[in-house]
Amino acid sequence: MAHVSFKSKEADSMSRWSKYLSTEESPPSASLSWRAMGVDGPQGSASGQKHLQMEPVVQLSKVAEGLLAKMYRLNSILDYPDPNAHTFSEAFWKAGVMPNFPKICITLSKKFPEHPNKLQLEKVDKFALDALNENAEGYMQNLEQWITLLLDLLEFREQALRLILDLSSTVITLLPHQNSLILHAFMDLFCSFVRVNLFSDKIPRKMILQVYNILHIMLKGGRDCEFYHRLVQFVDLYDPPVKGLHEDLNFVSPRIGEVLEAVGPIIFLSTDTKKLRNEGFLSPFHPRYPDILTNSAHPMRAQDLANVTSYREWVLLGYLVCPDELLRVTSIDVAMVVLKENLVLSLFRDEYILLHENYQLYVLPKVLESKRMAKSGRTKQKEADLEYNVAKQVEKMLMEVHEQALVSADALHHERRILLKQEIGRMVLFFTDQPSLLAPNIQMVFSALALAQCEVVWYFQHVGIASSKSSRGRTVDIDAADPTIGFLLDGMGKLCCLVRKYIAAIKGYALSYLSSCAGRIRFLLGTPGMVALDLDATLKGLFQQVLHCLENIPKPQGENVPAITCDLTDLRKHWLSILMIVTSSRSSVNIRHLEKATVSTGKEGLVSEGNAAYNWSRCVDELEGQLSKHGSLKKLYFYHQHLTTVFRNTMFGPEGRPQHCCAWLGAACCFPECASSIIPEEVNKIGRDSISYVESLIESIMGGLEGLINILDSEGGFGSLEMQLSPEQAAIRLNNATRAKAVSGLLAPGHESYPDNSSSVKMLEAAMQRLTSLCSVLNDMEPICVLNHVFILREYMRDCIIGNFRRRFHSMIRTDSCLQRPSVIESLLRRHLSIIHLAEQHISMDLTEGIREVLLAESFTGPFPNLQVFETPTETHGGGSAIDIISNWYIDNFVKDASRTGVVFDASQNCFRSSQPIGGGYLAEAFTDKRELKALVRLFGGYGVDRLDKLLREHTSALLNCIDSALRSNRDALEGLAGSVNSGDRIERDANLKQIIDIETLADFCIQAGQAITFRRLLVEAVGAVLEEKVPLIYSLLKGLAMQLPEEVPDKNEIIRLRRVASSVGVGDKHDAEWVHSILAEIGSANDNSWTLLPYLCAAFMASNMWSTTAYDVNTGGFSNNLHCLARCVSAVVGGSEYTRMEREHRRSSLSNGHMDELQEPELLSRVSAEANIKSAMQLYVKLSAGLVLDSWNDTSRPYIVPKLIFLDQLCEMSPYLPRSTLEVHIPYTILRSIYHQLYGASLMATEPMEPSPRQSPLISLAHASPSMKQNRADTTPRSHTFEPGYHSSSGSQYDEGYEGDRRTGERQLRSMRRSGPLDYTGTRKVKFVEGSSSGSHGAGSGSLQRFAVSRSGPLSYK
């Protein structure tokens, strides 16, 4: 095994840092110039003097970042231990770095720096020591990289300290306004040196060193590792680190004090918010002198404000490690200003130490010692008094500033955030309106970005910070709902966007400045003072090279500025070379000589011009780097959890602004820059965390967007506006207001809106404003790029709105206990769509298309079987969840009556009724009247109706299969029944009736089938009404097309499809039979001769027990157990089966003959013959049923006869295949008239005993006369079982809104036709009809009805 060896030779001192100086990272722009200096920079002047070498300074600063990153990684692996308190978690021992033997390891750490051999570890834990000895090789390998880290810390300390001492002793001046470039490089290294050593106290250095050494002893026969004693000395010196820093930096302390004093004015300015505002340091125009730009009023101050964050860090770190400098008179104020507004001292990323505790622990004792020395009089009396007073003031300041910071730190920063919010907001507005002034004020923009960056980072650094040693145990209160953070992030984002937008203009302005600068520098070089300096050849050559670079800068002209590519690295390199020479104490010409020689001209000195040229050159080719330095928020990655919390608290809060969300998201773009290339696993981790942060914020943003939409789409939102004033109330108020003499007691218009409602209106306005603002911002936001992930907020917003619409749509469908009424769903849907259309006006995307896709997806379960001929695989069936819910609910509750709520069909109102609410919600009529079904059709369109029709078909097909099975199983009994009817043998007929099995169950099935057919009829009528209303041309086309279809049996496939489409919209009068016919064709039933016995099977229902449990309801015009739906089932199934039988016979004939005789083809293929057969079968059913009813007539069965007679009368009325007078052939109409008279008369007496009934008008006598007298009506056939004066046609005309008017018109016509009473029925009347007709019209042919001459008012015995 190759162990670590220590080499300290100067030759390879920099080669060991190659792993920390990764070329993949983009170094700061300044370091590029420094690194270039290492190759081409001068090694000395003509006299052979040695000048400054700045490349090692910059390299060591980068090395410090690498060392900090490695220590940060070790700290996280070890679960953030506390080595000073010897507190280690369970995860520390399971991390795989240290051996899992806590007793031995903690003992070694506590006894440091004693040698492990002297600790008698076998007495501490003999078993652990033996295990350590056995696996020493593996444990030592685990510690290799971390012991190397300690060696790197040792080497870094030696090299950095040597450089710091060399710079402090050789640099003439370190003032910000003269030598800022070298000053920043020097202070960066100084601060990095301090941070590295302070951070090293957070890792278990003693334990790592001691455990590694004992493992080395075990493996190498008792020898210590070669670097052990030097590392012990190093760790012991820096235990604690501040103590070692005090000793190491004692010699550079005066220079640090000078620097901190020099940056004091800028720090004072940055904390004086009043002066910043009044003097316009962050405003393009001076507040008191609007005719001048502030850039020319105080350019250096505006530029230095960009560095104030660094200056504050210099003060905090400098006075901590150089406490003697606090005893300067001016240092007290500088230190107090910075200490008063901070509680922590940031070390690296989110690692920190408590600021005031460390000052009181390490700085205060030094001050007290100086105070004692001054008091003892070791110095001169006057100086002793001054030093004593200063030390006393510093002592007082350090004792009090902690409490002041706890009280005022957050308030100070909050005030500063408000200032920056205002100034940056104005700056964005100004530069947006006047972009030409952005370039001259670019340094001011950088200053504003830097100050805002500092405030945002400070806010998150201090979240949850608690002071452990405060006398009151207080914590700084950070408001998580502070909206200023969002404003700052938003302002910074907008400023950066402005800079990037006008980067060509800034570049052009900088090039123009540099071009003019060349002339000024040439002039200054030719002044008498410079000539007198007698510069050496090196400096002269460098100045000439600077002039050459400036004079060869391309001239920006017109539109070619963006195309200019200009690399000014050489210019900056040459100027830095000049600075390194003239700032060295070894140079014969220094910076003071240059300033004195050129400042007498009344213009800027040579050094100032050169520094300005240096800064403006960076605006040409390094502008993006500068923008990233001052405006980047990558450090917020380490606080991204706090960032998410504050975002959620401020985004939609009372003072929040939803439009700030883009800035919160944009911060994540720079998060991956935090990853250190020397720790590969960091790249993936930070990338995952960044993506997770963006996804979390997007989830919150979309949740807020949904919340805004749902607030508006609620009863307290737009819903409240719908209920403010009913139309009736509005009409009363308006009518009252227009009258000359208003009715007293009614308020005039304008008083309806109570003052209490104004707040709700304001809430709606605020919600609408936030919604539109958020949509607009998300729509305009650029894509968020995090590593290889791209987040496009428009797409997320569209998905959010569409997804929320889908969820809201599903919630609209159901109430707590029931389905919502379709009309209510439609109203809620329209309200939600109005909100989406409001948002759509601010989005450059088509949301309406997405809404249609959702509605289509919720309605679509497959293509239209009759319109769309393409086939879809069965496995691709999906969607339609909403229509599935509604369809299944309708089938279960109105066709199957699964909830047992007593659902019956009300023929008078053309809807279903129930005796109790369905599911505790509404009655059945609230869901099935024409208005609700039309709303259902409008909601789900043709696909939804098709789904409902498909479920009806499935249910009906199952019932038809049961009928088919019953016909097959009862074929013998039915054939016997047919024979006995033809022979007139009643005994055999009764015997055959008794042999029919499951007649009760079959009757229930047929009633259910009738309910399905009835519901389907209501549905197609609603479809037809909606089509006629919305697309009247298409409806008219279908209606005309249905009348022109060829009368052939069987139809061609295209004709079948057209006929079914027409039937699906309620066109025609026989669509019930057509629908049953299509079902029978699909399931393959009615393929044998057993279906010819269907009339006999249906007639057998007259012997069922269901008649004994039913009652006729005069209000609904139907039976309590829906027996009237059985009539529709019989008519439809007989008709559909006959069409199927004829098609089957046609196919058999085609197969047997090979072809058909052309002369016979028209007769065989005519639908007229099919309808004649249907009519014959229906007449047979009526005849057989009437015979069974009359034959069973006796006193005990009389109550059961009445429902049967009414049922047969209803059948003749509703069937399109039977004339209205069919029943009169078998049963005298006088009987029916008497029955209706008794039922309706009793009902009228019970409901309206005090008023004359309108039903006793002459119209009633006509309504209950023989049907033969009512054939003169052109298009309707009356229903004898109702007393309503209007009637449905046999073709199933609809009961709609115009029905009442038609009823009154018909009533007036009928009154004029007949004035006789209800019993005026003479024997002179004739019944006329044509047997071959399938409609209610009648031709020649008549028969006398002599039995009606002896009719009585009550039912007669029929023999």
UniProtKB/Swiss-Prot annotation:
Residues 1267-1359 are annotated as: Disordered. It comes from the Eukaryota. Residues 1272-1282, 1300-1310 have a biased composition (Basic and acidic residues). InterPro entries: Nck-associated_protein-1. Coiled coil: none annotated. One of its GO terms (biological process) is cortical actin cytoskeleton organization. One of its GO terms (cellular component) is nucleus. Involved in regulation of actin and microtubule organization. Part of a WAVE complex that activates the Arp2/3 complex. Belongs to the HEM-1/HEM-2 family. PANTHER family: MEMBRANE-ASSOCIATED PROTEIN HEM, NCK-ASSOCIATED PROTEIN 1. Binds PIR. This is Probable protein NAP1. It comes from Oryza sativa subsp. japonica (Rice). The lineage of its organism: Eukaryota, Viridiplantae, Streptophyta, Embryophyta, Tracheophyta.
